[in-house]
């Protein structure tokens, strides 16, 4: 939102022991404050010091969606992600469970109280329904995220909180989860507008609801319903492709015309050490994502396989990746010029000397800037267009599917750039005239044959365009799992050969050493250990298979 009010303390249980239980619902101003407290759960929690709560939104979201594909890699305890070695006690998975249910808990408390509010306190007759819609949409978003990670999860409803209902079983089927999520999104979709309430960007909107409702339908393989929601976003929504791909992740530049929903991290007066003591709107992308050669921690490297797979002319490579020999256009630092960092890999764990320009946009700690004002853009139009393409192919409309891919690739080759401006990249990176873009069907037919994919041509095209368009964002591994493509992905993109049979061999070739064979059970993550220990209705026998 333009100004997001933090209500962490206001919504904690102990506050209900001090204030009357209906205090939040006596005035409309109090209702809005309570609603803002639910929005606060999109942000990090800088007080708990638990798991990855301090980088919530980035971890585990980006890690669970990318590192298991091996396109993104990390050292230290985060190496478990790309090695498929995660366990039920992994802190990131604990954070995902805890933080998602924190949002659900707040939404349930709010919805229970809102239903008792006197309608006369609202200045507009529609306001109460709008506040309900926003709360239900956020609850549905969190439930949907939990199902992507864990499958069946306990469903707390208004009247049930983590305190009042510490023990609740998983439902028998995913359909029970999906039914509640669908009801919430449909209600919110029909109440909310395309534009955010009061022009406060950061609030959920009709576009948010439609995009995530479509995601739910795609999980259910109801492609016709998903297609209708996605088509509406493209045809009726206010969104357009940003002309320059490089403008999508600029520092302190929020809500491009392409953005459907993002979590804004603004530039603040003080962003040095200790700034997080007064604000949860702090996150340190720079330290996590910069090259270790230049002060990074090694949490976000990209693979040489990803780098080598880009087609000549695809500008998404230069706008989103900086590799050995490249110079970061924001910091002026060249990768691989320092002894011990000058190979294809660096460090004792052999991390690729390849990094994401989406998040490494400053010198970490330089001028006492510890935290970074870059939005987490959870949904944008390009992703919706690729989802729509998939649904078109699944419903027999191949021509429209290929047209969506054509439009995405047209922007990727810079053909929307003539006449555009770029905020931070060198201006001479912009195209001044249009160029010819290779035909996607022709190219991917050759790529499919070369790599040995067995899926339909359109599936290869869609997943590869997601790879390039949404690298290091929020969906790739989840899409591979949903589409049933994981096994062939690893065989095609990260094959085990004589040339990469050991880590030492990989040092010579730039290949990533794959520590695992794909197992279908790992397309879900394990229920966190703490939940099994504390929830008497979920025992070890209820753990996801394989863990």
Identify the role of each PLM range:
Residues 32-36, 40-50, 71-150, 172-176, ...:
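Conserved, well-structured interaction surfaces
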Residues 332-380, 546-547:
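Active-site beta-strand/loop architecture of penicillin-binding DD-peptidases
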Residues 8-77, 178, 186-187, 203-347, ...:
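An aromatic- and glycine-enriched ligand-binding surface/loop that stacks and positions planar moieties
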Residues 7, 59, 64, 72, ...:
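Long, intrinsically disordered, low-complexity segments
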């Amino acid at each position: 939102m333009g100004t997001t009010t933090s209500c962490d303390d206001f919504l904690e249980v102990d506050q209900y022991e001090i204030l009357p239980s209906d205090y939040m619902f006596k005035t409309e101003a109090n209702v809005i404050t309570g609603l803002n407290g639910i929005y606060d759960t999109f942000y990090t929690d800088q007080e708990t010091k638990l798991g990855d709560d301090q980088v919530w939104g980035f971890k585990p979201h980006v890690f669970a969606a990318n590192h298991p594909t091996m396109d993104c890699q990390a050292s230290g305890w985060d190496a478990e992600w790309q090695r498929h070695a995660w366990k039920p006690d992994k802190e990131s998975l604990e954070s995902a469970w805890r933080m998602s249910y924190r949002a659900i808990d707040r939404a349930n408390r709010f919805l229970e109280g809102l239903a008792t509010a006197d309608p006369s306190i609202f200045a507009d007759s529609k306001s109460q329904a709008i506040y309900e819609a926003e709360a239900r949409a956020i609850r549905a978003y969190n439930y949907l995220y939990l199902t992507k990670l864990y499958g069946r999860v306990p469903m707390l409803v208004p009247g049930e909180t983590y305190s009042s209902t510490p023990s609740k079983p998983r439902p028998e089927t995913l359909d029970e989860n999906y039914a509640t999520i669908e009801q919430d999104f449909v209600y919110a979709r029909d109440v909310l507008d395309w534009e955010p309430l009061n022009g406060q960007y950061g609030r959920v909107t009709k576009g948010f609801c439609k995009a995530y409702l479509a995601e739910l339908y795609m999980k259910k393989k109801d492609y016709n319903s998903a297609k209708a929601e996605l088509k509406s976003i493209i045809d009726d929504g206010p969104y357009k492709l940003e002309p320059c791909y490089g403008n999508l992740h600029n520092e302190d530049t929020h809500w491009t015309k392409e953005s459907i929903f993002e979590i804004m991290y603004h530039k603040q007066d003080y962003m040095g050490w200790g700034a997080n003591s007064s604000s949860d709107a702090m996150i340190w992308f720079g330290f996590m994502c910069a090259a270790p050669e230049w002060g990074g921690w090694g949490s976000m490297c990209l693979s040489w396989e990803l780098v080598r797979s880009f087609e000549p002319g695809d500008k998404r490579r230069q706008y989103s990746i900086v590799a050995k020999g490249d110079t970061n256009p924001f910091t002026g630092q060249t990768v691989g010029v320092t002894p011990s960092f000058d190979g294809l890999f660096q460090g004792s764990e052999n991390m690729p000397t390849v990094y994401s320009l989406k998040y490494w946009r400053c010198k970490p700690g330089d001028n006492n800037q510890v935290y970074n004002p870059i939005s987490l853009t959870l949904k944008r139009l390009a992703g919706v267009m690729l989802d729509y393409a998939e649904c078109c192919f699944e419903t027999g409309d191949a021509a429209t599917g290929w047209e969506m891919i054509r439009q995405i690739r047209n922007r990727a080759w810079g053909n929307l750039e003539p006449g555009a401006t770029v905020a931070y990249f060198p201006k001479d990176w912009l195209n001044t005239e249009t160029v010819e873009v290779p035909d996607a069907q022709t190219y991917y037919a050759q790529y499919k044959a070369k790599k040995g994919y067995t899926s339909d041509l359109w599936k290869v095209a869609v997943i590869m365009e997601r790879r390039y368009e949404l690298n290091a964002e929020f969906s790739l591994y989840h899409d591979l799992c949903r589409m049933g493509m994981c096994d062939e992905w690893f065989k095609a993109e990260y094959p085990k050969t004589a040339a990469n049979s050991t880590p030492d061999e990989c040092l010579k070739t730039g290949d990533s050493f794959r520590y695992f064979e794909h197992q279908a059970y790992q397309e879900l993550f394990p229920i966190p250990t703490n939940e099994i220990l504390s929830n008497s209705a979920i025992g070890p026998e209820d753990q996801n298979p394989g863990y």
